């Protein structure tokens, strides 16, 4: 069987460096020279006591990192501080990774190479230069773990460190944000930004001005979740979704009443299906002007829920609730939900009471959240494969960091089968064969259903496998930590962001030498993913820090990737008696299908970004306006100009401070109310905008036109409403002042993430936002 051994690449060409987006090979070479120069200061650093080391760090001049002559001294001090405080002595490659992050790059460091320590050193470097650093993780567990783990190093350099999780109170969050380095998950930072858009007093603000974002698992945050909207919702009296309509749609017959496209991304009613529903709904016309943007939209959403979203693939049902599965991580997507109509449709499909959604008070995508930071850098094990997206959407370069020890993992070429059944049989036999030797096996599957099917078959064959998926992800740290033990067989969904290294011999490395002698960890993939990056994340679990390891992927012509992205006439069907495809070109054909899938994913990202970009620009204008109302006398000055008579009356009764507060509350209320209604309008447009194509209109152009028109009137309407309230709000009978009780804000708010449905369109319309508040 053909194998390839993954080894450290040699010197990269200058052309390749430019393609990566890193400044130049010369800059990487300069960083390497600075790492080597740091050796000259190591003895001096070692001779300092802890207090002297801290003072030496404080004396460093790191304000201008690109020109600072103190970089070598900083590296020597950081290395010494790390060894004293964490018992970890950074390798040269870890210092190099830190320097490239200090240069504003995303670094690619293989699994097990010490990204966490490298990131902490980079964060300390920025902080010593006077910058405020947010180390952004993909979940609360990693935020707290890394802050507590790396905190002693950061504090040894005279800096402060804090962390934030979902349980943190407002006061704890404020304290954490005042630290030099703050660890927090991307969603918690986003939710703090959103909640700050409801405060009516500067003292209630929590989130500081963004400065430096250092992102762990950067490709996961910046690419996989870039377009995930974070949402702040409040109580409202919205209509309950029509459960009966959702059930009617569930009774439709596939092929006769509705059809799906070839890659099962879209579903639509047939004429017969439309007639059947129209009859059940009392003889209405679904395509009439009255129903096309309401009832027909509900029908399409219900179809999506019933046909395209599969239980144990896209979501699981646990504790009488629907939990979304993060497709790139294979675990429950905490706090995430689909757009309101789709969430309710899935809940109705599963016979679960629909959950309260409220109204959206504010929203921001992860991409827009990160783009607020003047400086962005990060680290991941698979940055190169995401290089194009990082350049296109964030203008970030990628710096690959060579491993401390050469990677000697052996990657076997794909084993390809004609049918999925033959592939599964071959996987079971292969795992059983490897398990008999005692070599630990890690099996990476695509979804919960596949992991459970494989686990069940292995157990029936006497293989003592353990399974890790979205249903038991609370046990992941323990399961993954022991996946390298002698004889272990672990079946897991996606491995991205698991945050725990697999050490040969188990967590205590007791059987390390014996497992290494057997060939190290053996990784089995049950099929290619839509992106090579996810394949590499799975493979990268083997061959950690120069350990031996191996990997092999099993695929079939019936796999989803092949069905959607490789034409049937390009799939060779000649196979052996076990159903394995004989041609040597099979792996190349899979590569082709994967490239097509990656291209489509990039298109989807770009097209969805085009819809979100306008909302992000409009939100930025609202934020600027709100900040002015909150921090300056703008509200009082504008209302004094608009309603001079009423202002003069109140000025005689009230102190300037109290009058200013009343004006601010009125202006903020109507601005927030207008933005909330504008977001609801945009959501309604997006749910039905694809129907514009039926009238030969470009959906994106129409969305932009309607959104810009509505936003232009938002400003005037908010100011007019504020003026009316200011003039008509009754005065209190017993004391000076104005009764603002009718300006009721939501009695409760909550946050969640929306697992959005991308809108595909190839045209980017030119945007121009009016200076609506100017």
From Swiss-Prot:
HAMAP family: SecA. Keywords: ATP-binding, Cell membrane, Cytoplasm, Membrane, Nucleotide-binding, Protein transport, Translocase, Translocation, Transport. This is Protein translocase subunit SecA 2. It comes from the Bacteria. Belongs to the SecA family. It is a peripheral membrane protein. SUPFAM superfamilies: Helical scaffold and wing domains of SecA (SSF81886), P-loop containing nucleoside triphosphate hydrolases (SSF52540), Pre-protein crosslinking domain of SecA (SSF81767). Gene3D superfamilies: Helical scaffold and wing domains of SecA, P-loop containing nucleotide triphosphate hydrolases, SecA, preprotein cross-linking domain. One of its GO terms (biological process) is intracellular protein transmembrane transport. It comes from Mycobacterium sp. (strain KMS). The keyword Cytoplasm applies. It is found in: Cell membrane; Cytoplasm. Part of the Sec protein translocase complex. Interacts with the SecYEG preprotein conducting channel. Has a central role in coupling the hydrolysis of ATP to the transfer of proteins into and across the cell membrane, serving as an ATP-driven molecular motor driving the stepwise translocation of polypeptide chains across the membrane.
């Amino acid at each position: 069987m053909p194998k390839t051994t993954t080894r450290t690449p040699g010197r990269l060409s200058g052309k390749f460096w430019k393609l990566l987006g890193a400044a130049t090979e010369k800059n990487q070479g300069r960083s390497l020279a600075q790492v080597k120069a740091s050796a000259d200061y190591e003895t001096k650093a070692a001779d300092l006591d802890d207090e002297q080391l801290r003072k030496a760090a404080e004396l460093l001049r790191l304000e201008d990192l690109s020109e600072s002559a103190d970089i070598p001294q900083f590296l020597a001090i950081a290395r010494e501080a790390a060894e004293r405080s964490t018992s970890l002595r950074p390798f040269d490659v870890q210092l190099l990774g830190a320097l490239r992050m200090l240069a504003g790059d995303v670094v690619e460091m293989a699994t097990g190479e010490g990204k966490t320590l490298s990131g902490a050193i980079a964060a300390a470097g920025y902080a010593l230069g006077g910058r405020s650093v947010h180390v952004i993780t993909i979940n609360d567990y990693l935020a707290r773990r890394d802050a507590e783990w790396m905190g002693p190093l950061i504090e040894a350099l005279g800096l402060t460190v804090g962390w934030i999780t979902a349980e943190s109170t407002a006061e704890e969050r404020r304290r954490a944000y005042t630290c030099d380095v703050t660890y927090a998950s991307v969603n918690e930072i986003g939710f703090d930004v959103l909640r700050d858009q409801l405060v009516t007093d500067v003292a209630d603000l929590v989130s500081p001005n963004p400065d430096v974002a250092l992102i762990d698992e950067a490709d996961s945050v910046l690419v996989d979740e870039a377009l995930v909207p974070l949402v702040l919702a409040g109580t409202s009296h919205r209509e309950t979704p029509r459960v009966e309509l959702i059930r009617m749609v569930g009774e439709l017959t596939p092929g006769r009443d509705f059809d799906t496209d070839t890659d099962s991304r879209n579903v639509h009613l047939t004429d017969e299906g439309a007639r059947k529903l129209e009859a059940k709904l009392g003889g209405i016309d679904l395509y009439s002007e009255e129903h096309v943007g309401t009832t027909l939209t509900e029908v399409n959403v219900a179809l999506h829920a019933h046909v395209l979203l599969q239980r144990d693939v896209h979501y699981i049902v646990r504790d009488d609730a629907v939990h979304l599965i993060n497709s790139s991580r294979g675990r429950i997507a905490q706090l995430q939900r689909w757009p309101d109509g789709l969430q309710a449709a899935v809940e109705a499909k599963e016979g679960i009471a629909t959950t309260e959604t409220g109204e959206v008070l504010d929203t921001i995508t992860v991409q827009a959240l990160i783009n607020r930071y003047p400086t962005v850098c990060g680290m991941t094990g698979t940055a190169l494969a995401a290089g194009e997206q990082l350049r296109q959407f964030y203008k970030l370069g990628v710096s690959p960091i060579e491993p401390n020890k050469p990677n000697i993992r052996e990657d076997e070429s794909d084993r390809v089968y004609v049918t999925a059944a033959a592939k599964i049989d071959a996987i079971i036999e292969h795992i059983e064969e490897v398990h008999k030797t005692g070599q630990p096996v890690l099996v990476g599957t695509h979804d919960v259903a596949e992991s459970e099917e494989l686990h069940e078959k292995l157990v029936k064959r006497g293989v003592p496998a353990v399974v890790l998926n979205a249903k038991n992800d609370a046990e992941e740290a323990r399961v993954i930590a022991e996946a390298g033990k002698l004889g272990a067989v672990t079946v897991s969904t996606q491995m991205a962001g698991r945050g725990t290294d697999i050490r040969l011999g188990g967590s205590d490395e007791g059987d390390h030498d014996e497992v290494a002698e057997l060939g190290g960890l053996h990784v089995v993939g049950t099929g290619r993913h839509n992106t090579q990056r996810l394949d590499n994340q799975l493979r990268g679990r083997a061959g950690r820090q120069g350990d031996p390891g191996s990997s092999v992927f099993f695929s079939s012509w019936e796999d989803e990737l092949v069905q959607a992205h490789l034409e049937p006439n390009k799939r060779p069907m000649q196979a052996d008696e076990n159903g394995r495809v004989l041609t040597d070109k099979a792996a190349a054909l899979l590569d082709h299908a994967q490239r097509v899938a990656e291209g489509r994913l990039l298109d989807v990202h770009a097209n969805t970004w085009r819809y979100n970009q306008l909302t992000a620009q409009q939100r930025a204008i609202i934020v600027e306006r709100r900040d002015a109302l909150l921090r300056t006398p703008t509200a009082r000055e504008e209302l004094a100009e608009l309603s001079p008579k009423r202002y003069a009356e109140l000025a005689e009764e009230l102190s300037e401070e109290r009058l200013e507060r009343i004006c601010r509350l009125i202006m903020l209320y109507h601005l927030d109310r207008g933005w909330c209604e504008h977001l609801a309008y945009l959501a309604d447009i997006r749910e039905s905008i694809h129907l514009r194509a039926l009238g030969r209109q470009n959906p994106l152009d129409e969305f932009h036109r309607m959104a810009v028109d509505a936003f232009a009137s938002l400003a005037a309407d908010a100011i007019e409403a504020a003026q009316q309230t200011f003039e008509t709000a009754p005065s209190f009978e017993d004391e000076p002042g104005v009764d603002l009780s009718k300006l009721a804000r939501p009695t409760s708010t909550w946050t969640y993430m929306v697992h959005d449905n991308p809108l595909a369109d190839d045209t980017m319309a030119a945007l121009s936002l009016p200076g609506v508040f100017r």
